[in-house]
Amino acid sequence: MKIRPLHDRVIIKRIEAEAKSAGGIILAGTAAQKSTRGEVLAVGTGRILDNGDVKALAVKVGDKVIFNEGYGVKTEKLDGQDVLILSETDILAIVEA
């Protein structure tokens, strides 16, 4: 199945962080926090401005990003894996290698 986000929406696959504490102890279950890093799988056409123009998004497919997981972030299943659908404004940074 293919999902195409609309407008300023972005589809992200979460990149799971290793569940270790600062002291090197492996955390289990609820002690491990979900990662807020992911890879952009698809982007919408852009944000519609008040004057009707469309502003292209700053992120592109393949970008590694840090995002804010909060109100408005939707989790969906895509080909058996969880993906996140969120607005570009929920993306805090692009991680450059």
UniProtKB/Swiss-Prot annotation:
Sequence similarity: Belongs to the GroES chaperonin family.
UniProt gene name: groES
Oligomeric and partner information: Heptamer of 7 subunits arranged in a ring. Interacts with the chaperonin GroEL.
Name under which the protein is recorded: Co-chaperonin GroES
Single GO term (MF): protein-folding chaperone binding
Compartments where found: Cytoplasm
InterPro entries, per the entry: Chaperonin_GroES (IPR020818), Chaperonin_GroES_sf (IPR037124), Chaprnonin_Cpn10_CS (IPR018369), GroES-like_sf (IPR011032)
One Pfam family per UniProt: Cpn10
